[in-house]
């Protein structure tokens, strides 16, 4: 077997280069033709039944309104009841024929079975599943005292998606539906303090890429990798090393610095267009793709830059990180050049 591997090691790079030179241009032309057809004959979701998890805020909320505008029936899921009912009422005002709000915890297997079953019993079908619920643990791995407190990242971000998909897939297959996976650019790009978040999103991407191969044409899978989108997370709501959700704006400033925050509405519109076209992937905004390319071809440099920007020198406080100093300069610049409005 070792000799076979040696032969493959020699031949495969040559065959790969040949394939790229000969077949890649044709492949891209075919992709362009398919993309044009998908734009011309995009899916009409009016009258279809859509389940959205994490629908009480952020991308999930904005997607509920986008689906509502297009006339879809909605089953909205979130662990927070009051904001969920508010979103459900607004989604109906936006045009959804009927909205079913369901309070549930996606990290619990029984809850996922319950809300999928309730959706199918109520509407009689299921066409789209949007797995959006997630939390963002934000701390250094070395600071953890009890590693079991890190489990919510996988329980919610990964297993929450898996559980929903397990119970929804028979119905999605029956109606040739689609799974819309809200992953993250962090699933491709490592970032200090986000080890568990990055790991959970990378697992989500790998899981659904594998499922797409298994499902074939029976169930479509669109994997979305957003950048920083206006949400509770982008406003500083993170999970601590003790497993508690807190708002820490100072930590938010260090971690996100001057990176642009995209509105949830803009992101949801891009996702909606991508879903209706039947896209396999969506990187939103587009510059996320450039960062991923830099990581692939200059991985050492991107890791060094992330550490240089986001981690303060030893024995210095967190706020001494270069990312926070850049933000301070940006604030000072804005204050200096701002003019009163009359």
From Swiss-Prot:
Gene3D superfamilies: NAD(P)-binding Rossmann-like Domain (3.40.50.720). Pfam families: adh_short. GO terms for molecular function: oxidoreductase activity. NADP(+) binds at residues 54-80, 105, 197-201. It is found in: Membrane. InterPro entries: NAD(P)-bd_dom_sf, Sc_DH/Rdtase_CS, SDR_fam. The chain crosses the membrane at residues 10-30. One of its GO terms (cellular component) is membrane. Substrate binds at residue 184. The active site is at 197 (proton acceptor). The keyword Kinase does not apply. One of its GO terms (biological process) is steroid biosynthetic process. It is a single-pass type II membrane protein. Keywords: Lipid biosynthesis, Lipid metabolism, Membrane, NADP, Oxidoreductase, Signal-anchor, Steroid biosynthesis, Transmembrane, Transmembrane helix. PANTHER family: 11-BETA-HYDROXYSTEROID DEHYDROGENASE-LIKE 6, RETINOL DEHYDROGENASE-RELATED. This is 11-beta-hydroxysteroid dehydrogenase-like 6. It comes from Arabidopsis thaliana.
